[in-house]
């Protein structure tokens, strides 16, 4: 499976895939994204907070580990049933609040229904960071002074 910023490579283990990030050859542009180590860090953080103890019963984030310059390992998920964010808006609002407390602005992610009924949140390449003045800055440098959450 290939996207604009990288591709997913199946491994011999059916529960593990490799997320390979396209190498950046030009300066940051509107489509620039975080590199593999930062994507893995964001995904690992999100995986650690999307727990039953934190109030999540449907939303979860697949594990990510072993970041390298242009790739990292990730738990396999099914991507054949996209989910509209409105279907799990309560848990997404909780996720946004926890992310904001860490200085993270979630955006441009994807949601997929899993065979067990849970919803996997993936795609951390365009997450922005909150700045002290209440604006957010994206990986390609754009700053929004009044960011709006989709919920």
What are the language-model segments listed below?
Residues 16, 72, 120-122:
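Protein kinase-like catalytic core scaffold
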Residues 22, 36-91:
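Conserved structural core of kinase catalytic domains
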Residues 2-47:
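ATP-binding glycine-rich loop module of kinase domains
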Residues 10-14, 76, 114:
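Active-site beta-strand termini and strand-to-loop segments that position acidic
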């Amino acid at each position: 499976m290939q996207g604009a910023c990288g591709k997913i490579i199946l491994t011999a283990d059916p529960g593990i895939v490799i997320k390979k990030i396209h190498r950046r050859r030009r300066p940051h542009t509107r489509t620039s994204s975080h590199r593999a180590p930062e994507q893995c860090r964001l995904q690992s953080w999100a995986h650690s907070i999307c727990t039953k103890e934190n109030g999540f019963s449907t939303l979860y984030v697949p594990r990510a580990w072993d970041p390298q310059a242009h790739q990292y390992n990730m738990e396999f998920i099914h991507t054949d049933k996209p989910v509209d964010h409105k279907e799990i808006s309560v848990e997404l609002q909780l996720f946004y609040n926890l992310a904001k407390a860490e200085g993270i602005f979630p955006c441009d992610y994807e949601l997929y229904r899993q065979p067990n009924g849970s919803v996997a949140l993936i795609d951390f390449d365009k997450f922005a960071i909150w700045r002290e003045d209440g604006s957010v800055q994206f990986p390609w440098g754009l700053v929004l002074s009044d960011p709006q959450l989709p919920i």
